[in-house]
Regions:
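Long, low-complexity, Lys/Arg-enriched
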Residues: 1-104, 115-168
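Short glycine-rich phosphate-binding loop at a beta-alpha junction
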Residues: 104-110
Length: 168
């Protein structure tokens, strides 16, 4: 875990890492730039086959955060592959713990595999946990997007907050 040097807001950011480290990193950058979130804690949740990308994602998150003037605590949690019930239970428990500690919780589903995303969202909805944001970086095209967020034309990408979108 990377300890925070600067206390940010009382926000925590849970991000699901699947096949694309770029998707995770770019979604995080978009959330900071477009939504203004400054999480005090970042948790990268991944499945074992994709865990090798997690340290790279953590370093990128740290560098991007520092560029915005803060340093979150970063942790990595690896889960067995395709165990959506276990993934959901772990993410639910993690979110409940963060909320109990006074954090507002945001979840980014952009890079997560469908089974992990489904498990997380089902588990959270069944117990009525109040998640503040569910982020997804929507791309109009997947051509040539494995590069930094600021190098992808903004007209083909849009950070969505599913909680805001469904409340409107």
């Amino acid at each position: 875990m990377i300890d925070p040097e600067i206390a940010g807001s009382r926000d925590a950011y849970i991000t699901l890492l699947g096949r694309s480290t770029w998707a995770l990193v770019n979604a995080y950058h978009a959330v900071l730039r477009e939504k203004g979130l400054r999480p005090e804690r970042v948790s990268i949740v991944t499945e074992e086959p994709y865990a090798e990308g997690a340290p790279t994602a953590a370093r990128a998150i740290l560098m991007i955060s520092e560029g915005y003037g803060f340093t979150p605590a970063i942790e990595i949690e690896a889960l067995p592959r395709a165990e959506f019930v276990r993934a959901g239970a772990m993410i639910r428990s993690f979110a409940e713990g963060l909320i109990a500690q006074g954090y507002g919780v945001a979840i980014d589903i952009t890079s997560g595999r469908k089974v992990t995303v489904a498990g997380a969202l089902i588990a959270i909805s069944l117990v009525g946990i109040r998640i503040q944001h569910i982020y997804y970086l929507a791309m109009q095209s997947l051509d040539d997007v494995a590069k930094p967020y600021m190098m992808i034309p903004h007209q083909i990408q849009r950070i969505r907050d599913l909680m805001e979108d469904t409340a409107a």
